[in-house]
């Protein structure tokens, strides 16, 4: 993988165009994260680097370019699967919040998100599921109040 790199302020290396990748995974990843974070595509790289550093940001953007774009699953289904995975994983509430919004944007309903967390209690335990449903409900309330 070749990187477009120039010298930036203070001698820091700055990625100009992101990595050169096979196909358009980079661009699709930027689009996916722009949608998830509700920011312009041109701001995704800096935003991600601020969150997780350059190495992880690059991997996440390229990976998202493949994971969120194919014809096997709808965006709604993918969103519900990701919400379920994050609830099951536990301890990733900050990552769960934007995925709740994204699931709604992709066609899931508030009732489906709450039912998903309730079902997960049987499989991942009540502690993780209850934290998950708490985050889901908080995010639903926040989004509802933002719409008013």
Question: Which residues make up each language-model segment?
Answer:
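N-terminal alpha-helical segment
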Residues: 60, 78-80, 96, 113
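Substrate/cofactor-recognition hotspot
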Residues: 79, 126-127
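Amphipathic alpha-helical segments within well-ordered protein domains
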Residues: 65-68, 82, 100-104, 117-118
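Acidic, glycine/proline-rich low-complexity segments that act as flexible tails and inter-domain linkers
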Residues: 1-76, 130-148
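Extended intrinsically disordered, low-complexity coil regions enriched in Ser, Thr, Gly, Ala
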Residues: 92-115, 129-140
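Short, structured motif recognition centered on aromatic/hydrophobic residues
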Residues: 77-86, 116-120
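Short alpha-helix boundary/capping elements
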Residues: 56, 85-92, 124-125
């Amino acid at each position: 993988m070749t990187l477009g790199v120039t010298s930036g302020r203070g001698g820091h290396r700055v990625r100009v165009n992101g990595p050169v990748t096979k196909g358009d995974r980079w661009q699709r990843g930027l689009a996916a994260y722009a949608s998830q974070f509700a920011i312009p595509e041109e701001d995704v790289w800096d935003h991600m680097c601020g969150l997780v550093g350059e190495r992880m940001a690059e991997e996440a953007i390229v990976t998202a370019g493949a994971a969120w774009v194919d014809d096997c699953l709808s965006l709604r289904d993918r969103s519900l699967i990701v919400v379920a995975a994050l609830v099951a994983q536990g301890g990733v509430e900050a990552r769960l919040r934007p995925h709740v919004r994204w699931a709604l944007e992709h066609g899931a309903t508030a009732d489906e998100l709450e039912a998903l967390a309730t079902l997960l209690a049987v499989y991942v335990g009540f502690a993780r599921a209850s934290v998950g449903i708490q985050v889901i409900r908080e995010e639903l309330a926040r989004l509802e109040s933002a719409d008013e």
